[in-house]
Amino acid sequence: MKIVGISCSPRKGKTTRTSLDKCMGAITENFPEIQTEIIDLAGMDLRGCIACGHCMKNLECSQKDDFNDIIPILQDPDLGGLIIATPVYLGTMSSQCKAFLDRTVMFRRNGFLFRDVVGGVMAVGGFRNGGQEATILHVQSAMLVHDMILVGDGKPGSHFGGTMWSGHPEGIEKDDPGLKTVESLGHRVAQVALKIHG
């Protein structure tokens, strides 16, 4: 089984990717039987959906950009979990995240291929209470349209997902409360994915 993480920041190697690395690391450390992969959208040519309908017939997009390289990874029948990590921009997800989610409509149109895939979301904000939970809910709404199974960060907090603060004076790696939520999110996605997909 495989769990894929998507880093939706336009900035390569920054706080969103660091947070996702921690989340995916918790999976690798605690569930060695699960394969993990991270797709970093930073620097990719990823355009928004143009609603042309081309993908209604097959898993192919009419736009010739980097999303076409992502399709084979996401259509893998071993996909058991999908974790989306996004920065908070003006109280919601990044434009890269929105473009990515809109383009995944092809998986819905071709037999709901994400049905029963376990979904988790994490958001990185510039303030401790900087819109992370609202952003997570926005991403989760797209996952629900795919008929995915959503989980939060589990015990002990059991909230919407991973919530990180990029404004910590000593760097995001010192955001201990936030790190606990992203590590717990990874653990929870893996735990539920194993129960469903074995």
Please give the residue ranges for each predicted region.
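Short, glycine-/small-residue-rich phosphate/pyrophosphate-handling segment
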Residues: 95-96, 109-160
